UniProtKB/Swiss-Prot annotation:
PROSITE patterns: BIR_REPEAT_1 (PS01282), BIR_REPEAT_2 (PS50143), NACHT (PS50837). GO terms for molecular function: ATP binding; cysteine-type endopeptidase inhibitor activity; cysteine-type endopeptidase inhibitor activity involved in apoptotic process; metal ion binding. BIR repeats lie at residues 63-128, 162-228, 281-346. Anti-apoptotic protein which acts by inhibiting the activities of CASP3, CASP7 and CASP9. Can inhibit the autocleavage of pro-CASP9 and cleavage of pro-CASP3 by CASP9. Capable of inhibiting CASP9 autoproteolysis at 'Asp-315' and decreasing the rate of auto proteolysis at 'Asp-330'. Acts as a mediator of neuronal survival in pathological conditions. Prevents motor-neuron apoptosis induced by a variety of signals. Keywords: Apoptosis, ATP-binding, Metal-binding, Nucleotide-binding, Protease inhibitor, Repeat, Thiol protease inhibitor, Zinc. PANTHER family: BACULOVIRAL IAP REPEAT-CONTAINING PROTEIN 1. The keyword ATP-binding applies. Residues 464-758 form the NACHT domain. ATP binds at K476. This is Baculoviral IAP repeat-containing protein 1a. GO terms for cellular component: basolateral plasma membrane; cytoplasm. It comes from Mus musculus (Mouse). It comes from the Eukaryota. GO terms for biological process: apoptotic process; cellular response to estrogen stimulus; epithelial cell apoptotic process; negative regulation of apoptotic process; negative regulation of epithelial cell apoptotic process.
Length: 1403
């Protein structure tokens, strides 16, 4: 066997690129880009993985077992993949062919695994039907014996002779040594890997690595004389006892089976279907309504079997259905015409020859034919228990054979396979579930250990009395029917050991019926009959070879005596029983069970498998289904039973047009199913739903999803009521008291929502009050959008005119519950939420921390959307409008809210909104941090010398730069797969023409953009034309303005603000800006270019109120301003930053003409005209912000005018120096008059150092102070004064205290400060950093004092302490404090420098 593997050039593509545009539209990403990136990663993984023939995975059952941990959110089932030769590698989602080593990472809705396999590796010998040792999942080790060994039996008495027979032993079986096999008495037959004992004639095959030939010999043929001559009876007994599965089963049970068929050994083309067997397909046409037997034969050869409905035939391989077959049609041509991709038709030989060829390839040799199915008519082929009996004594045997044939005939009929589920799900019959493997775990009654089982493992372990438990609709009936069908088909060798299989429904029997009577009534039909005596004799003779499949078990008390005895006294009959039991009823039968099987949640891959069966013509809808549940991870478990899947199918049939795949539709369909099933008990069902809803509601708001009997009783739920079992499950295993759960957490929320709607819609006031009580438990936006998001969605799916206004009003008031906001975020834990919800919750929390304003806009938009949807669903828009209008008043919302229907119906409501914002984000990735600039700032510093214990206080900049670079690449790749989508303006307000009301103010944020494309331009043209005022905020977006020129020219009179940062303005763009007559605010910052044309013509903006120019290091800005610049009479904000010397004369004149100036920031280095500047500033009584930096400042003139600014809120002089004490004292005194001051950044200098304590005491006169900063000037005395003022009642509103770079403070001074600081209830940010040369190595007492200080600051979220050298013990103290802090989840401590050098570490 040649090694198969991928070379470095052997790249494969799993992607169907022709379908990617459709996927791009659904996902909103560039699927082609994503696919290419994904293929590259997968190729790298392939290159690492081991290649070559894997003999350990030639067993399909073993391959199937590898998928136990495989993600179920896939479009291929494990059964399909295992049948196609694949096993799960454990590397991501990679699957690999055992034969050709093909590795696949993806699934496909359009291609089956076998189709993908054949396309990518047509040369695979497994696919070509060659003998590569594949072992079918239902195959067994025991083989039919040869009539005569080659050369005669006597020839092989000697071990060496036996060993010589293994000359052509197949490569795939080399894991089992021919020498060991020959020593155990076996001779190689020459057929596959089948060996035969020279003594007893027993034949075994399917040898795998690790098999013990002696153990296999002893298990299957314990009476062999050669075996008994070599092994003691105790050894043989130990071999048998230690064998896994097949209890009480020997080889003769399989060899003498009455239901044996010749099987195609290559399962790859069979799509896991028993109808790969041509004979079985022929059997399905027994009830074929057409006449021509020739046509039937042709249909069978074309791979088709009869479904039993309306003349419809179906292909066993591709699943395609055809009907209206007429005389003269060529079924193969018709099959190929409608289903050209069918693998069965694409096999190397013609379709008519494929299956016979597969069968003949693996056919049993002639010597084995005596035990094939032809032995039904062979009088010589008799059961081993009949040998030596007389004709009359063997009567039971003939009856048993006849009974077996009748049973098989019944089970293979379409009427048995197809059992319609109740009316609502009539389209989905059990025959569509036959091909699905349910997920099963095994629970041995005497052992608490549970283990997952594959279906082959279940079949191997059928013995004694077992049950299969599951929820309502979990697939118990289908599972039992599948066993009966597989047995009858003869296509499941694992079931050959059963001569009789009885599938009995216990729901339609009476206690007085005999067992034979039940069998005749349910299974044998009008012509069949068997006596009780004969049946008893058959069971007594066959014992373990009889399997009872008992469905609809409800309790021992209702059973006839015969069945009661079979269960409770199984040691008498020794038959096998598998009983289907609802989870609630297991307890009553547990003492009689050996093993309990439990059906777990129906895998989502099975759901997709079934949907593909029904909707293969609508792949787009299937794709949308996969995308929906991929994007809503928390919903993936809702299809937990086949019954829920049936509800999905029903919904799709009833709503053939594309609908959103909402979980509400699923749950509603399920409730409809219950109402149809229990038509005669409508009132009891309604009462049960109501009481269960109350329990669900109570549990939901106490985070309880498990309940006991007391909980049920309190809610009025009858735990013994059968209807309750349709909504809840009972769990009793390993528990003193039973535990009850709803069918799923989301289903509990659905029932709770039904109950809440019922309460709010009630005519009883106490019910309404109770409903309102529960509704008010949702007391924050975070809870509404995360914890109770699904619950609210379900509430809205039950619209109620009474509940509508109440719910809408409550939701819209949540945004303004500011007093609850912080506590909610502090206490709400997302560990116990589903992954998707937890991620959203974490993201919202981070958004709130980073930008409370954006957070408010986000939650406002989402709550408004939710509330409006409910108002429309409940038809209460008019009643809700007062709440809606109140909510809209003065708010800033996202532009997309205008797509809501409300703004089409009530466009006048738009006038209440403050503004609407729209963000346009491009795919450019700007450099977040320029490390070269940081490195330059450290050039003059010498690396500090520190002890080894403190080395962790410094981290290498290169490592951070590397990580940041990698992150930037990741962000770039992510951005590349998300194509820029223009804002959607397709519904709601945008349907109005003309627009009766305009958007009061449109805020347009543009980031990382290049020129806009035509689609975006068209959208902006429409949006701009509907806006009364437009404000731009552009960043890193050179060329964007020019690209939207047509939109700006149409609406230039509406543009009132333009803020531009880190972009280059072309001359054309500067000219374009100059055509905006209504511009009131202009900001230019951080650009490498001086937009001289724009600045030369600033006087043309006659209404300009705000001018911000931040161009450090650029040519003199003030010099390029026009002479007419001072004539701008409406200036309210003036912020100029330039590091060049500047002429202030124009600026002074402008201020002189600006009586309404509120904000003044200036940074420049010009030293003249300062007096005139101060003089003119003194007249600006309305100033609220003043900031001076650079050399253009004289302290005394400014201090003299400072008391004039009684409206001042922000004073920033942090970069100015006051050298003399007199000026500094005067400054300190003046501060007392600024009673509205909120931010004070104190100047530096010796003079300020001398009066620092006075400045601190003056802060007692500043009750509004939120920010206070001292740099370089504090010492031990002045810093302790801050603590004294705080304890005296000052700083009550202080949020930020910046004490960095105060190197005059000693460690003792800090320790005293920490010990004294208290009574700062709102302090969020404390900065005590030092320069690197001033690193401070602190004692344990200081660290302890710092920890105690932090504990007394309840609102602290940021502590900056760079250059504080902390060892491991110090950090333990700090971290312990952090863990106990009220803001533990938000508190961040900055204590590590990121530097371009390594410190000098002392040994």
């Amino acid at each position: 066997m040649a090694e198969h593997g991928e070379s470095s050039e052997d790249r494969i593509s799993e992607i169907d690129y022709e379908f990617l545009p459709e996927l791009s539209a659904l996902l909103g990403v560039d699927a082609v880009q994503l696919a290419k990136s994904q293929e590259e990663e997968e190729h790298k993984e392939r290159m690492k993985m081991k290649k070559g023939f894997n003999s350990q995975m030639r067993s399909e059952a073993k391959r199937l077992k590898t998928f136990e941990t495989y993600d179920t959110f896939r479009s291929w089932t494990p059964q399909e993949m295992a049948a196609a030769g694949f096993y799960h590698t454990g590397v991501k989602l990679g699957v690999q062919c055992f034969c050709c080593s093909l590795i696949l990472f993806g699934n496909s809705l359009r291609k089956l695994p076998i189709e993908r396999h054949k396309k990518l590796r047509p040369e695979c010998e497994f696919l070509q039907g060659k003998d590569v040792g594949n072992i079918g999942k239902y195959d067994i080790r025991v083989k039919s014996p040869e009539k005569m060994l080659r050369g005669g039996k006597a020839r092989y008495h000697e071990e060496e002779a036996r060993l010589e027979s293994f000359e052509d032993w197949p490569f795939y079986a080399h894991g089992t040594s021919p020498r060991v096999l020959s020593a155990a008495g076996f001779v190689f037959t020459g057929k596959r890997d089948t060996v035969q004992c020279f003594s007893c004639g027993g034949s075994l095959g399917n040898w795998e690595e690790g098999d013990d030939p002696w153990k296999e010999h002893a298990k299957w043929f314990p009476k062999c004389e050669f075996l008994q001559s070599k092994k003691s009876s105790e050894e043989i007994a130990q071999y048998i006892q230690g064998y896994e599965g097949f209890v009480h089963v020997t080889g003769e049970h399989f060899v003498n089976s009455w239901v044996r068929r010749e099987l195609p050994m290559v399962s790859a083309y069979c799509n896991d279907s028993v109808f790969a067997n041509e004979e079985l397909r022929m059997d399905t046409f027994k009830d074929w309504p057409h006449e021509s037997p020739v046509a039937v034969d042709a249909l069978v050869r074309a791979g088709l079997f009869y479904t039993g409905k309306k003349g419809i035939v179906q292909c066993f391989s591709c699943g395609g259905c055809m009907e209206k077959c007429t005389e003269g049609d060529d079924p193969i041509q018709e099959h190929n015409k409608f289903f050209p991709n069918c693998v069965f038709l694409q096999t190397p030989k013609s379709s008519a020859e494929v299956i016979p060829a597969l069968q003949s390839h693996c056919a049993l040799p002639e010597a084995m034919e005596t035990t094939s199915e032809s032995n039904h008519d062979d009088p010589a082929a008799v059961h081993s228990t009949v040998v030596g009996l007389g004709r009359s004594e063997a009567q039971w045997f003939q009856e048993a054979r006849s009974l077996s044939e009748q049973l098989r005939d019944n089970y293979t009929k379409a009427t048995f396979r197809h059992m319609n589920l109740p009316e609502v799900c009539s389209s989905l019959g059990t025959d569509h579930l036959i091909g699905c493997d349910v997920s099963i775990i095994s629970k041995h009654i005497s052992q608490p250990v549970q283990g997952a089982l594959t279906i082959p493992e279940v079949f191997s372990n059928l013995s004694s009395v077992m049950c299969v438990e599951g929820e309502t609709g979990s697939g118990k009936t289908t599972f039992l029917k599948r066993i009966a069908f597989l047995w009858a088909s003869g296509c499941c060798p694992l079931l050959y050991r059963f001569q009789l299989v009885f599938y009995l429904s216990l729901s339609s029997i009476t206690p007085d019926q005999g067992l034979a009577n039940i069998i005749c009534a349910q299974l044998l039909g009008a012509g069949g009959c068997i006596s009780e005596v004969c049946l008893s004799s058959i069971i007594q003779q066959l014992q373990h070879q009889v399997l009872f499949l008992l469905d609809d078990y409800s309790g021992l008390a209702s059973l006839p005596q015969a069945l009661h005895t079979l269960i409770t006294k199984n040691y008498l009959s020794r038959t096998c029983l598998l009983i289907a039991v609802h989870t609630n009823r297991v307890r009553g039968i547990r003492s009689y069970l050996d093993t309990s099987l439990e059906i777990k949640e129906f895998p989502l891959s099975n759901t997709v498998y079934i949907l593909k069966k029904f909707f293969s013509h609508n792949i787009k809808r299937l794709l949308e289904f996969m995308v929906y549940f991929g994007q809503n991870e928390d919903l993936q478990g809702i299809h937990k039973t086949p019954l829920f899947v049936a509800a999905v199918c029903t919904d799709w049939f009833e709503n053939p047009s594309d609908q959103p795949f909402q979980d509400m539709a699923l749950f509603k369909s399920y409730m409809q199913y219950l109402s149809l099933k229990h038509k005669g008990a409508a009132k009891p069902l309604q009462a049960t739903v109501s009481s269960c809803g109350q329990l669900a509601l109570t549990g939901l708001f106490s985070s309880c999803f498990e309940f006991n009997s007391d909980d049920l009783a309190e809610a009025g739920v009858d735990e013994d009521e059968e209807l309750t079992t349709c909504l809840m499950s009972k769990f009793t295993a390993q528990r003193l008291r039973p535990v009850y759960r709803f069918l799923g957490p989301l289903f509990q929320e659905f029932l709770a929502a039904m109950r809440l709607t019922e309460l709010l819609s009630s005519d009883r006031q106490e019910d309404q009050d109770l409903g309102l009580y529960y509704l008010r438990q949702i007391n924050s936006p975070l809870k509404a959008l995360t914890t109770y998001n699904n619950f609210l969605k379900y509430v809205f799916s039950h619209p109620s005119s009474k509940a509508g206004p109440t719910v809408v009003s409550h939701l819209l008031h949540l945004v303004d519950e500011t007093e609850l906001l912080e506590n909610t975020y502090k206490n709400e834990d997302y560990v116990n939420h589903p992954p998707g919800t937890s991620r959203i919750m974490k993201g919202l929390k981070e958004l709130w921390l980073l930008s409370p304003e954006y957070y408010s806009s986000f939650v406002s938009e989402h709550l408004l959307r939710i509330a409006l949807n409910f108002a429309y669903e409940s038809n209460t828009v008019a009643e809700c409008s007062p709440f809606i209008l109140q909510f809209l008043r003065g708010r800033t919302l996202a532009l997309k809210v205008l797509n809501l229907q409300y703004f089409r119906d009530h466009p006048e409501s738009l006038l209440l909104v403050k503004s609407l914002e729209v963000s346009i984000n491009g795919n450019k990735v700007p450099k977040v941090v320029d490390y070269s600039v940081m490195e330059k700032s450290f050039e003059t510093l010498q690396p500090p010398t520190i002890d080894q214990d403190y080395a962790s206080a410094f981290e290498q900049m290169k490592e951070h730069e590397k990580n940041l670079s990698e992150n930037e690449e990741t962000i770039k790749s992510i951005k590349n797969i998300f194509p820029l989508q223009p804002p959607k303006i397709s519904s709601g307000y945008w349907k109005l023409s003309p627009k009766p009301c305009k958007i009061p103010r449109l805020e347009v944020g543009v980031t990382n953009m290049g020129p806009a494309d035509q689609a975006l331009l068209q959208v902006l043209m429409e949006v701009f034309s509907a806006s009364q005022s437009i404000e731009f905020r552009l960043s890193d977006s050179s060329g964007f303005l020019e690209s939207i020129r047509p939109a700006l020219e149409l609406s230039k009179a509406s543009v009132t603000k333009c803020s531009m940062s880190r972009l280059e303005l072309s001359r054309a763009e500067q000219e374009l800006l100059l055509t905006l007559p209504a511009l009131q605010s202009l900001e230019v910052s951080e650009t490498n270019q001086l937009p001289d044309q724009l600045f030369h013509n600033l006087h043309k903006f006659l209404g300009l109120k705000e001018l911000c120019v931040r161009l450090d290091g650029k040519p003199d800005v003030l010099s390029v301003l026009p002479g007419e610049f001072p004539n701008l009479l409406h200036m309210e904000k003036l912020s100029i930053r330039t590091s060049m010397e500047s002429d202030l004369s124009k600026l002074v004149k402008l201020i002189q003409n600006s009586p309404n100036l509120h904000v003044f920031h200036l940074k420049c280095d010009f030293l003249s005209n300062c007096d005139s500047l101060m003089a003119v500033l003194a007249s600006c009584k309305k100033l609220r912000e003043i900031e001076f930096s650079g050399r253009c400042f004289e302290a005394m003139p400014f201090v003299n005018i400072l008391p004039n600014f009684i409206s001042l809120k922000i004073l920033n002089l942090i970069s100015q120096q006051f050298p003399d004490k007199e000026t500094s004292e005067k400054f300190a005194q003046a501060l007392g008059s600024l009673r509205n001051l909120e931010e004070l950044l104190v100047p530096t200098g010796d003079g300020i150092h001398q009066v620092a304590k006075l400045i601190v005491r003056q802060c007692l006169q500043l009750p509004c102070l939120r920010v206070l900063a001292f740099h370089y000037i504090l010492d031990n005395d002045s810093v302790i004064e801050i603590a004294r003022v705080a304890t005296s009642g000052g700083f009550q509103k202080l949020e930020k205290l910046d004490l960095s770079m105060n190197h005059k403070i000693t460690e003792e001074g800090y320790r005293n400060f920490f010990q004294a600081l208290d009574n700062l209830p709102n302090l969020q940010n404390l900065n005590i950093c030092r320069h690197i040369p001033e690193c401070i190595q602190v004692q344990a007492t200081t660290v302890k004092a710092l920890g105690q200080c932090v504990s007394r600051l309840p609102s602290l979220t940021r502590l900056h302490m760079l250059s504080w050298l902390l060892d491991e013990e110090d950090m333990k103290v700090i971290n312990d404090v952090k863990e106990r802090h009220p803001q533990s989840k938000r508190l961040i401590i900055f204590w590590k420098w990121i530097v371009p050098f390594s410190p000098v570490v002392l040994e």
